[in-house]
Design a protein with these regions (language model features):
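Residue-level signal for inorganic ion chemistry
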Residues: 12, 114, 195
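N-terminal glycine-rich flavin-associated loop
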Residues: 97-116, 142
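FAD-binding core of flavoproteins
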Residues: 3-4, 96, 123-213
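Active-site glycine-centered loops adjacent to acidic/histidine catalytic or metal-binding residues
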Residues: 69, 114, 163
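Conserved protein kinase catalytic domain
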Residues: 85, 106-109, 122, 196
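Amphipathic, small/basic residue-rich leader segments at the start of a protein or domain
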Residues: 1-99, 120, 124-127
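Tryptophan-centric aromatic hotspots in well-structured domains and transmembrane helices
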Residues: 15-16, 22, 26, 54, ...
């Protein structure tokens, strides 16, 4: 028994046993397509689909989104995601494709989004059914976020966003983007806002995605 296991609460110990049993019986076979080294290098839609199927099965088994409340698609547990991650790593499972969604979008949406937004976005994010990308870097500015030029302007109840983003990994597969842009030009270090943008629905209607490599 590892030191971590010795510190498990009864609930965590039961959950760890569930993870171990499920993984022992449900690991996928050899990939039917060639997979790149990591999710951010995905370019083959068939590889993405294979990995999405794996993420959905792990999500349905309760190994992903464990610590989020049930009402937003989570498992309703406490301090259990790290246990699932450890057991998946030990079992040498495939990587999860929706890493930007899970690592960057989900926490922000959960802690800052309205209840109806969380209920709409988080279940399919955690299951991997909807892929997310990030829109931070820009031509000429790279990752210098203070030099953002993409601008969002109010138009009644809507926002109109104009600009360009680069190195938007997974954008060619994504339904959603977490987008950082300027809503005020008064101060270089202020006036930055964070948007959730449905880029797939806007393709050909103001949004263009072009792979660089």
């Amino acid at each position: 028994m590892s030191e971590a296991q010795k510190m498990d609460t009864p609930e965590q110990a039961a959950f760890r046993a569930h993870c171990q049993e499920w993984l022992a019986n449900n690991l996928p076979g050899r990939p039917t397509v060639k997979l790149p080294l990591g999710a951010l290098e995905l370019s083959d839609p068939n590889a993405l689909a294979w990995l999405q199927e794996w993420q959905k099965s792990a999500y349905d088994a309760g190994l992903i989104g464990c610590d989020y409340p049930r009402e937003v698609g989570g498992g309703g547990r406490e301090n259990c995601q790290s246990i699932a991650n450890t057991e998946m790593q030990r079992a040498q499972t495939p990587y999860l494709p929706n890493i930007i969604g899970m690592g960057m979008a989900a926490p922000t949406v959960f802690f800052h989004g309205r209840d109806e937004v969380k209920a709409e976005l988080l279940p399919k994010l955690l299951s991997g059914e909807e892929i997310w990308c990030q829109g931070f870097s820009e031509p000429g500015a790279g990752s210098d976020l203070a030099n953002q030029q993409t601008f969002a302007e109010r138009d009644g109840d809507n926002w109109v966003i104009n600009g360009h983003k680069v190195w938007t990994s997974l954008a060619h597969f994504a339904e959603w983007m977490i987008l950082l842009c300027r809503t005020s030009k008064d101060d270089k270090y202020n006036g930055l806002s964070y948007f959730v943008v449905p880029i797939e629905k806007a393709l050909g209607n103001g949004v263009t995605v072009r792979p660089l490599i």
